């Protein structure tokens, strides 16, 4: 075991004190939040009925940050609550009708991806819970052709048979009731079809169709069943996380083969379409089969509702998963090719470089500033010379945003983290912890003043108030830009364990800061803000997929450095009031990924 000791007292930096205050505060707030909004059995204090296919994801999102927070260093109480609440949400939305066999009956993979973050967090929290492993395998079976009741996978054509899918299988014909609780939301977006009667999408491609008008909605639903219900879309690539999750639990090669084959199928479709990823293929795998031959216009595709986002994000998620499984970064090239296409279509408007975000019958439209988050993630995941060039290309457009927001619970904007990692924003750690604390307190203040009628609350009510925010903690303690919220796994260069308590996460009183993240190394600072000695075991890779290759001491507490070549973990003993700062060399993707804790998992 590679051991580093820190024995020289030093003042604790502000970021470290704030980090520990944030963790301690969220431990308390999680309990108060659950007490305020749930019954004794954990069910949400809400309405008795909830129709339609939307909403279970929002129930899970209301507590979905809890297991990840525990894995970062949250309390055992939060861990216990995370499991109670998952079971309660599952039972409640089963009664409503959205969940079947403990999984969403049918919906799209943007929403599956959001709710599945809860499941992926359980793997990091405790890999030895038998029901977690059983669910991982059972849910993956629904997508790889091993579940007779959920025939989502077409092995012959290498496609998921519908954009709307789940534990009941593909939803090949949608009903008005399926959409009844989501029409208000979609009424704010551009029309999904350019030939809806009464909509002039030719002169105004962003024209809105009123989903709340019954006649208009009937026309939309008819076209949706004709054009979008059958066949595959890139959004379904997010299912690779669920199958990779099963692989991390088991190491079974069938899961790996499925992920790689499915991503390859979309790569081949892209090549067949002249280099642009089509946003739809029909039941036989033909591009535009249900869309009058058009490669655009599919469900969550290049046109509707979000545009390029719904193509690029699944390609990022699937490429990252494939790299995790193989160590081969070329699986992210498909993402890069689409980013390059959009960049090359860019133009200057009012002195600013803009790229298209959507494609319709009239071509590309909805130009705006290029989205930089994908490139930050790409560079953190792979970090080769081409990725560095991509990063520089975006950076040339202007400084990285330093805005710290909390749109989703496990996500924080990656651009401020990138500025810090490059060295241009050294105050980011302190500011990130301070802003996180302020956001937690702001949410607790909202909760204290929340005296409305629960029967009237929106289905997003609780997730918008959940005070357990993990985004900045992932950035600072694990050295990753964030988790891709709509279904990404927690790809990161390191994670920590508490060997004294035999649990994941930072020990009590210990704060961590990862900086200068490079493909071959990171800088790690650990601070013990308390008075008692603490021991931290730091693992190479969130899933033990990396190995450490060297240690360089960067502080004044020098001493003989042990050889850590090919080590999965490094042990730090830190006296009270002391800290340690090291550069850890690493070789990435040297091991099979596993949820197993240090000493428990496979060694290759």
Regions found by a protein language model. Give the residues of each.
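Glycan-recognition and catalytic cores of secretory/periplasmic carbohydrate-active enzymes
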Residues: 1-559, 564-604
